[in-house]
Amino acid sequence: MKDTIRQLIQQALDQLTADGTLPAGLTPDIQVENTKDRSHGDFASNIAMMLAKPAGMKPRDLAARLVEAIPAHEQLAKVEIAGPGFLNFFQDHVWLAASLDRALADERLGVRKAGPAQRVVIDLSSPNLAKEMHVGHLRSTIIGDAVARVLEFLGDTVIRQNHVGDWGTQFGMLLAYLEEQPVDAEAELHDLEVFYRAAKKRFDESPEFADRARELVVKLQAGDPDCLRLWTRFNEISLSHCQKVYDRLGVKLSMADVMGESAYNDDLAQVVADLTAKGLLTEDNGALCVFLEEFRNAEGNPLPVIVQKAGGGYLYATTDLAAMRYRHNVLHADRVLYFVDQRQALHFQQVFEVARRAGFVPAGMELEHMGFGTMNGADGRPFKTRDGGTVKLIDLLEEAESRAYALVKERNEQRAERGEEPFDEVQLREIGRVVGIDSVKYADLSKHRTSDYSFNFELMLSFEGNTAPYLLYACTRVASVFRKLGQGREQLGGKIVLEQPQELALAAQLAQFGDLINNVALKGVPHLLCAYLYELAGLFSSFYEHCPILTAEDPAQKDSRLRLAALTGRTLEQGLELLGLKTLERM
């Protein structure tokens, strides 16, 4: 609908330009937003206020000319002027109802695929191997997964790339520890965190051990067979731990998506050679760097992008440049999205610029850093265990499931007291699993990607507010309507007729699903989808309360309201699926 309104406004602008009301050459970015109060229309635009000055007119006068010039359209009932010159657009209720009937008959809920389709590489999760995933890996993993799902739904070809840290000093440290204590260490491999901490303790306390670790890194990089065999074993164990977490989270990541730092080792020397050939490298204290004039420190000096250390070693920037070239040359990406901590913003700005100057990626290939804030504890400080250690992600998920199980078990006892059929233990465990994992994911996804947030089990497991349990309950509420009816959603007759205010409000929200999904894909911000679903659930609750469904006044009204309920249920389920969340028929 927003695209239609933009097109109508553009047609009006073209007409006013042709008759001399507007000067030629204006190319405004036409903004169309949802109104906060639907009594003032469904959508609003500030285009008249934007163009009043170049037109030499008062905003309301220009708005009046625009209203006259906007062509009539079946989707619009009327256009009004509000305040200092806003244009308020009212949807035609008959057209709106018919569009929802079409959406209900469509497996895609009326959401058109975006065109032309792109090949999009999603760089997500990317934990360092040789130790277990911790809570800091949650955001990249689930935000990246949600955006990938949305892009796939809109027709893009999505290539997930798990750029794991499988190379570097930590492996020399682990190899040295395994060399010292082969029997005990092999046993400890099943708990990577214990093994890693023990090796790190030796590395920090013993200069001799640290020297040996560095020697083994050199041997590993030189292709020593024994070192490579053990390194491979470390990675296999570490990746198996990661996969268990991915499976528990329900994200679409598998071993086939792993493309770690080591995959680019053979290209790093060539990256440096190509940068040299382009005349981009400068030697600085033995290191090879690219200096970009637009990136300067506090003293005003250009900041270096170091691609090779004085000792010959390579850095993250070198690997990232090799990965960008691979993603262009081999994966043929049109767009690459990096879901990496916001604190790496400068790094990505620099390497993106170096990649373009070096010709590693073409001008038309989009490189976007989808930075995110940090997850903190309830006290607002970095999330730690009680003894100050790192919280394993798997432990967090297990606690979430345990807490959710206790919650649903308590509610199950209340069901029995009310005379309702209680769930058995198997059902309770499954409900607890879904509620627990969904709650952790939704609490994160519902926050703006770039914001920090405080992790709080009590808030995220609440059945009130913008939470997963609230939305899951909304889904079960819709399902209960059709259980009582004894009929499936796909067997409905009649058509939608919008009469009551609650019906109109619900219908207007349902009609915006496609626009919303496209916005999430464009900006990489799943919280917009969360906010949409939360508002949709609230509007359905109001509709359910004020508009009797199964006891409607006549069959036509009953059919209409059943169809609205069915479309609401399907939209909630589709939206939650795009976020990577499971749904329940009963809870």
From Swiss-Prot:
Example of a GO cellular component annotation carried by this entry: cytoplasm
Enzyme class, spelled out: ligase
Family annotation (CDD domains): ArgRS_core
Alphabetical keyword list: Aminoacyl-tRNA synthetase, ATP-binding, Cytoplasm, Ligase, Nucleotide-binding, Protein biosynthesis
SUPFAM superfamilies reported in the protein's UniProt record: Anticodon-binding domain of a subclass of class I aminoacyl-tRNA synthetases (SSF47323), Arginyl-tRNA synthetase (ArgRS), N-terminal 'additional' domain (SSF55190), Nucleotidylyl transferase (SSF52374)
Compartments reported by the entry: Cytoplasm
Protein name, per record: Arginine--tRNA ligase
Name of the gene: argS
